């Protein structure tokens, strides 16, 4: 089944409001009441309210995203461990006590796609603030992208090479926790093909193939699945920098 595109309104970034007072306090309450009831609202004011509402919503999403990011960088065992390993790769000749991950490499923004995050070898990690459900969803997403970050530093991944891309996607889906039992069951359940035995591996294969299918060098879904199968054994069993699948 094909996935429908995101709503078109998500692709549009709103303009800032005319003033901060227009989106706070009594003025914002009054405008919201007028919009919901239609009382005393001109077409121009209605359009302006819709723009301002999107602005307020995206600002809240952005603030919450960075709040979650900062909390996870300080308290999530998985995220802390991954950032430490990345810092070591970035600073091989530096004393381990001063390893520090640059959190500016993790930014929050609005995304037009359904995905919850992304990684770019030059820019770093993007968290899709409008797709994140809660702190724990962001933890899985951030852990996934940090595996890509680690792989890119350690092996100089060619992201247009389908085998390279597939290998990192397999590792990221397996090690991030996004395919742990309860997470996958919540997404799919028994009625949508979820199996208790080997469910983790099936989830990893499915999600890796979805990601690889978006590579410009991938022809179609079947091509992505075939490439994932080709590199499966070596990549799934490579749990570095963990000793084993942690989550």
UniProtKB/Swiss-Prot annotation:
InterPro entries: Peptidase_M76_ATP23. Keywords: Hydrolase, Membrane, Metal-binding, Metalloprotease, Mitochondrion, Mitochondrion inner membrane, Protease. Its main location: mitochondrion. Pfam families: Peptidase_M76 (PF09768). One of its GO terms (cellular component) is mitochondrial inner membrane. One of its GO terms (biological process) is mitochondrial protein processing. It is a peripheral membrane protein. It is an enzyme of class 3 (hydrolase). GO terms for molecular function: metal ion binding; metalloendopeptidase activity. Its EC number is 3.4.24.-. It is found in: Mitochondrion inner membrane. A divalent metal cation binds at residues 144, 148. Belongs to the peptidase M76 family. Has a dual role in the assembly of mitochondrial ATPase. Acts as a protease that removes N-terminal residues of mitochondrial ATPase CF(0) subunit 6 at the intermembrane space side. Also involved in the correct assembly of the membrane-embedded ATPase CF(0) particle, probably mediating association of subunit 6 with the subunit 9 ring. This is Mitochondrial inner membrane protease ATP23. It comes from Kluyveromyces lactis (strain ATCC 8585 / CBS 2359 / DSM 70799 / NBRC 1267 / NRRL Y-1140 / WM37).
